[in-house]
């Protein structure tokens, strides 16, 4: 298992004073799910897809089609992860011969490889246009969230009839996603080898992230669930985050200040490089993160 970049697991009250890390703005798309004629507001996915569109994560296949039940490609998922975390640093991906520079997704694949969420299907193939399987999707999300795979090593998957269909390389990630209650499976089981739909992926992200901060300013209201900050010049002051606090890769050139903030879940920093984290009460090591996006 690779070294984790989680700065602190705060399981009790941790009052952080003046945390300064870098940040940069992330783009969003001002659209509504109801703009798409194939969006069903009564469907099981309605809330999750609406949130994904509202937060600029999920784009339409055209100006009128969102294709919620369509299979998500590996390139599309890379793009959504990058948008979510505000990634901006790319790496050379010339070894992947099937990722042409002329393709819309070339930069997104390069960003995803740099972030560490994506590996090729072989040393020379990324298969960007291929549908992404459910176990691949769980792996990518688990990597992005830096889940502690060892902590979930004993997660019981026996309730899923198709447990044995999970590939050995994906098993730690699947256990972590199920153990963290981020994925619940389909009616017939986890179906790890099936392709994930666009709506299903939106639902997974909706299960994980309760809100996004994309506008500069000061926030002093308690935050329900987990929050992902993906812009700069944000101050959280005198508030409690009920879930995880995630500072995305976009934390690069500006600053984020946490003044008397209580985090009941995990504190994960992708951006901000190796800047120190100063806390009045600290429940885990809060040294430099060494994140590739910082």
Task: Identify the residue ranges that each predicted region occupies.
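Flexible glycan-contacting loops in extracellular carbohydrate-active proteins
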Residues: 174
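Feature responds to low-complexity, polar/acidic, surface-exposed segments characteristic
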Residues: 2-46, 54, 59-107, 114-171, ...
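Short, T/G/N/S-enriched strand-turn elements that build extracellular solenoid repeat scaffolds
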Residues: 213-294
């Amino acid at each position: 298992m690779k070294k984790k970049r989680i700065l602190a697991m705060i399981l009790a009250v941790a009052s952080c004073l003046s945390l300064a890390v870098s940040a940069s703005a992330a783009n969003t798309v001002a659209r509504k799910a109801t703009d798409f004629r194939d969006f069903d507001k009564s469907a099981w996915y309605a809330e999750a897809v609406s949130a994904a569109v509202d937060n600029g994560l999920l784009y339409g296949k055209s100006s009128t089609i969102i294709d919620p039940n369509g299979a998500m490609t590996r390139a599309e998922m890379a793009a959504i992860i990058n948008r979510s975390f505000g990634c901006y640093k790319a790496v050379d991906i010339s070894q992947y011969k099937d990722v042409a520079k002329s393709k819309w997704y070339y930069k997104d694949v390069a960003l995803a490889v740099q972030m560490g969420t994506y590996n090729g299907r072989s040393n020379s193939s990324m298969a960007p246009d291929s549908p992404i399987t459910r176990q691949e999707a769980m792996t990518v999300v688990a990597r992005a969230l830096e889940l502690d795979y060892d902590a979930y090593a004993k997660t019981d998957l026996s309730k899923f009839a198709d447990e044995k269909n999970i590939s050995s390389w994906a098993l730690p990630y699947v256990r972590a996603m199920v153990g963290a209650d981020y994925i619940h499976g389909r009616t017939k089981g986890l179906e790890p080898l099936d392709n994930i739909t666009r709506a299903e992926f939106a639902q997974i992200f909706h299960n994980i992230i309760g809100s996004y901060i994309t506008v500069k300013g000061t926030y002093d209201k308690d935050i329900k669930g987990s929050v992902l900050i993906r812009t700069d010049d944000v101050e959280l002051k005198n508030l409690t985050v009920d879930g995880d606090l995630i500072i995305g890769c976009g934390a690069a050139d500006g600053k984020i200040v946490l003044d008397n903030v209580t985090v009941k879940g995990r504190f994960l920093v992708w951006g901000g490089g190796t800047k120190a984290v100063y806390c009045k009460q600290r429940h885990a090591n809060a040294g430099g993160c060494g994140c590739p996006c910082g």
